[in-house]
C-alpha cells in the first residue's frame, strides 16, 4: 500500500469535496502559496488501497509552478462514499467518475498512479480529452508477479464472506498482518493510525472489485495511442509492481515521453518527490506550450 511519510498539508492546500453529477468526491486542493495561478490545473488519481494523501509530498511543489492541483479519493476509497454494487467499480465507471471530477475542476492534466493509471486510461478511452495524460508507475495490462499473488491472497481471504461481514474481515486483515507490515516498514505512529483509518474506511466491495480489475485488465495500449493524447510514462527504477521493461515498452508503443526516477520504487511521489514534481512540471509546461 502507498504510505505517505507525512500527513502535514503544504501551504495553500486544503481538504475539500468536489461535487459532480456522479456524486461527491473527497479531495485535497492545492493552490500556489504565492503568485498567480496561470497554468493549466491537474487532477491526480490514486492507486489501489490508496488515497489523495499519497500525493501530499508533491502537491505543494506542483502548485508552486503556478497551477491548481487536485488529488481525490476514488469511489469507495477512504473519504469518498462507495457503491454496494460491484459494477460501480468497473474501470469504465471509475473512469466516468474521473471525467466528471475533471470537468468540475476544469483540469487540463490527468495523472493516474498504479491502478489509478488504468482508471485514467479508461476515462481517456471513453472520450475524455485532457491536455496530457501521465501514467505513474502503471502498466499496460493486468498486474503481474508478486503483487498479483498478494491480490490473489486477499481475494482468497475475503472469498465467500457475506457482504455484512466484509468490514470485519478487512479489519482482521489489517490487525492480523498489514499493521505490523506498516510498522516494520518504518511508518511512524501518526501515519500508521492514518493507514488504519483509511484501510478500515475503504468499501470492501470496492476492495474486491478493484483487485479483480487489476488482475484482469486488458492491454489497451494501442487504443490509447490512437487517441493521440500527449502522454508521459513515469516510474521508479526499482518498481516492484509492473516491471520497468513493460512500462518502457508501453511508452514506446504510445510514442510517449518517459522518465525513470532514480532511487524510487512503486511510489516516486513519496520516495523521490522533488524529482517527480520536477519531471511532471516540465512535462505539463511543455504540453501547454
Predicted feature residues:
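Conserved catalytic-core motifs of eukaryotic protein kinase domains, centered on the activation segment
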Residues: 54-56, 80-86, 145-147, 244-245
Amino acid at each position: 500500500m502507498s504510505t505517505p511519510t507525512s500527513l502535514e498539508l503544504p501551504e495553500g492546500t486544503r481538504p475539500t469535496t468536489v461535487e459532480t453529477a456522479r456524486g461527491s468526491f473527497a479531495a485535497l486542493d492545492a493552490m500556489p502559496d504565492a503568485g498567480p495561478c496561470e497554468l493549466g490545473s491537474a487532477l491526480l488519481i490514486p492507486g489501489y488501497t490508496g488515497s489523495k494523501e499519497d500525493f501530499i509530498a508533491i502537491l505543494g511543489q506542483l502548485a508552486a509552478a503556478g497551477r491548481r492541483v487536485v488529488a481525490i479519493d476514488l469511489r469507495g476509497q477512504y473519504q469518498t462514499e462507495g457503491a454496494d454494487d460491484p459494477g460501480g467499480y468497473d474501470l469504465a465507471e471509475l473512469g466516468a467518475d474521473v471525467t466528471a471530477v475533471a470537468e468540475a475542476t476544469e483540469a487540463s492534466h490527468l495523472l493516474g498512479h498504479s491502478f489509478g493509471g488504468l482508471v485514467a486510461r479508461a476515462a481517456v478511452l471513453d472520450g475524455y480529452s485532457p491536455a496530457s495524460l501521465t501514467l505513474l508507475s502503471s502498466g499496460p495490462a493486468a498486474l503481474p508477479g508478486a503483487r498479483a499473488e498478494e491480490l490473489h491472497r486477499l481475494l482468497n481471504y475475503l472469498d465467500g464472506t457475506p457482504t455484512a461481514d466484509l468490514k470485519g474481515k478487512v479489519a482482521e486483515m489489517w490487525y492480523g498482518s498489514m499493521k505490523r507490515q506498516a510498522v516494520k516498514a518504518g511508518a511512524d505512529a501518526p501515519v500508521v493510525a492514518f493507514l488504519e483509518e483509511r484501510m478500515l474506511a475503504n468499501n470492501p466491495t470496492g476492495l474486491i472489485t478493484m483487485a479483480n480489475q487489476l488482475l484482469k485488465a486488458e492491454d489497451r495500449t494501442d487504443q490509447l495511442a490512437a487517441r493521440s493524447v500527449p502522454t508521459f510514462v513515469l516510474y521508479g527504477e526499482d518498481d516492484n509492481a509492473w516491471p520497468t521493461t513493460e512500462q518502457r515498452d508501453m511508452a514506446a508503443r504510445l510514442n510517449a515521453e518517459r522518465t525513470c526516477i532514480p532511487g524510487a520504487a512503486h511510489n516516486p511521489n513519496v520516495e523521490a518527490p522533488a524529482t517527480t514534481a520536477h519531471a511532471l512540471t516540465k512535462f505539463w509546461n511543455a504540453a501547454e506550450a
